[in-house]
């Protein structure tokens, strides 16, 4: 309901899609859905997808309203930063559970719905939101975040191989600096962050929405298991 998820939701709405958004905080999820409804039909399905029970609840409420799913964007995520000597087990458990396990189990739970979407003549799509920190090394001590996003990129490949036979295309987006609550530097110090980006600016809504629309559209139907890096060139500058 915020940040990158909101950018993608708005982009899909502008293309005529009916969009369901999910977030743990019901009030925020409802408010965002109400705001985005100015662009098209946007429905709020608040819930906690970090648990099996939360995923099942979300799926049941979705199925009460829809008989198929055309596009699933796995965007829920968490980060944790701490010095190497102090990095706690909780910082691994929370981040890996949400960043790697949740995309797998949510896709698994919605497999039947995606199959129904694929049966309409156009492939269904699963888009996992990874990070450039899973592609190249960030100097910040976010050990579990970097490892989980690298794992999600590889999981995207593995899932893509299995689900392609079902007419379900799995891809990923690896965002760079986009203003969000998770990336507060890009949100609060965009000019400073932009100095480290070859393109000279942080990402904007249309950059992220355009990437997701491409992958979910007919133009992206032959892109299977790939990760689209959307970062203004940062990954190459790190290399």
Language-model features: where?
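Short, small/polar-rich loop/turn modules that mediate ligand/substrate recognition or access, typified
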Residues: 164, 169, 223-225
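Residue(s) in the substrate-gating loop at a strand-loop-helix junction
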Residues: 131
């Amino acid at each position: 309901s915020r940040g990158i998820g909101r950018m993608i939701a708005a982009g899909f709405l502008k293309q005529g899609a009916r969009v369901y958004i999910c977030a743990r905080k019901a009030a925020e999820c409802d408010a965002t859905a109400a705001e985005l409804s100015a662009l098209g039909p946007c429905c709020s399905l608040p819930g906690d997808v970090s648990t099996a029970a939360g995923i099942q609840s979300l799926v049941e409420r979705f199925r009460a309203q829809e008989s198929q799913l055309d596009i699933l964007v796995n965007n829920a995520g968490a980060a944790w930063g701490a010095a190497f000597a102090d990095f706690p087990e909780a910082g691994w458990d929370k981040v890996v559970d949400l960043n790697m396990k949740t995309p797998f189990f949510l896709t698994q739970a919605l497999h039947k719905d995606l199959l129904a979407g694929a049966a309409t003549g156009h492939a269904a799509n699963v888009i996992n939101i990874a990070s450039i920190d899973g592609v190249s090394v960030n100097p910040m001590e976010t050990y579990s975040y970097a490892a989980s996003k690298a794992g999600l990129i590889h999981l995207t490949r593995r899932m893509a191989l299995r689900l392609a036979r079902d007419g379900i295309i799995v891809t990923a987006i690896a965002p760079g600096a986009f203003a969000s609550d998770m990336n507060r530097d890009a949100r609060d110090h965009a000019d400073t962050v932009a100095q480290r980006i070859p393109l000279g600016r942080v990402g904007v809504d249309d950059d992220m929405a355009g990437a997701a629309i491409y992958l979910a559209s007919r133009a992206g139907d032959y892109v299977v298991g790939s990760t689209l890096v959307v970062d203004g060139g940062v990954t190459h500058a790190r290399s």
